[in-house]
Amino acid sequence: MKHRVQELDEILSRLSLAFIQLERSGKCCGGVTLSQCHALDILSKNGELTMNELSRQMGLAKSTMTRIVNTMVRKGWIERKKGEGDKRLVSVCLTSDGKKMTETLSQSSKEYVQRILKNLPQEKIPEVVESLRWIVRSVEKEVCTSC
């Protein structure tokens, strides 16, 4: 068991570093940061969200989310809307350019996953997918209990 813990720790660490390197290189999403990719994806699936809702779904502090949103507003991908009754309530939604960017990113993501799958033995893919599902559930459960 001790060996398995160490082995999984090393694998998860390498995976995390690989994603960090991918984001820093700007290649993961065509020059778009990974956080921007996730925010665009969440907005494309949910439509208009308040900043609080988007921060919660991203798992980020509101101040961090605000910086990400500011950049995406400047790039013309999303727009802010003030609340009708409460002007302090701010929501965000995709612009037409944001929707186009989301479609581009979705296609890039699919191509990236296809390249990864080509490097795996075809008969192992279902097993890999199921294992990743279990890992994600376990990590999400741990994140939720440590908040």
Each predicted region: which residue ranges?
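N-terminal helix-turn-helix DNA-binding core of bacterial DNA-binding proteins
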Residues: 22-64
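Charged, amphipathic alpha-helical coiled-coil/dimerization segments
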Residues: 70-127
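A structural signal for well-ordered alpha-helices, especially hydrophobic packing surfaces
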Residues: 16-19, 102, 136-140
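DNA-binding alpha-helical recognition surfaces that contact promoter or target DNA
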Residues: 67
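N-terminal leader segment of winged-helix/HTH proteins
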Residues: 1-30
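Terminal interaction helix/tail motif
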Residues: 2, 6-9, 107-147
